[in-house]
């Protein structure tokens, strides 16, 4: 069964890839569907991986820290879980006047499947909320 440690490691690798400038094609390797979209539940937006690449390209010094995550087993074959939890996220606008740093607690709701290769893949990726800290730079998604 997929474990919380595996989910955290998988999520950390995805976040590190995005923060390092991963292309949409490189990000797609983390998804079961190479044309996946990221769903932003709190405002109704959906973001293609191409748009996700462009969005993150404007920031520097991105950092993600996992908060608490719960797993709900969904299926044994293929092996799937629903992973819900929080991630503290910060990223800096290099050319913007202060405040430059986005600081937010982000709600994550993911369906993850173990592929035949053994690798984990996002089946569904939803951001359920972005709680911006009082000293955060504004962000319009």
How would you label these PLM feature ranges?
Residues 12-13, 37, 41, 97:
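Residue-level detector of alpha-helix boundaries and kinks
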Residues 6, 10, 51, 104:
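Soluble or luminal CAZymes and related metallo-dependent hydrolases
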């Amino acid at each position: 069964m997929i474990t919380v440690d595996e989910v955290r490691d998988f999520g950390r690798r995805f976040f590190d890839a995005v923060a390092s400038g991963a292309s949409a094609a490189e990000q797609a390797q983390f998804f079961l569907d190479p044309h996946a979209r990221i769903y932003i539940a709190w405002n109704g937006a959906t973001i293609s991986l191409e748009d996700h690449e462009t969005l993150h390209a404007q920031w520097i010094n991105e950092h993600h820290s996992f908060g608490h995550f719960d797993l709900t087993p969904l299926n044994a074959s293929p092996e799937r879980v629903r992973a819900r939890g929080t991630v503290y996220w910060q990223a800096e606008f290099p050319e913007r006047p202060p405040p430059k740093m986005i600081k937010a607690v982000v709600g994550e709701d993911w369906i993850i499947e173990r592929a035949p290769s053994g690798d984990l893949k996002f089946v569904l990726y939803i951001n359920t909320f972005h709680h911006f800290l009082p000293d955060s730079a504004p962000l319009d998604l």
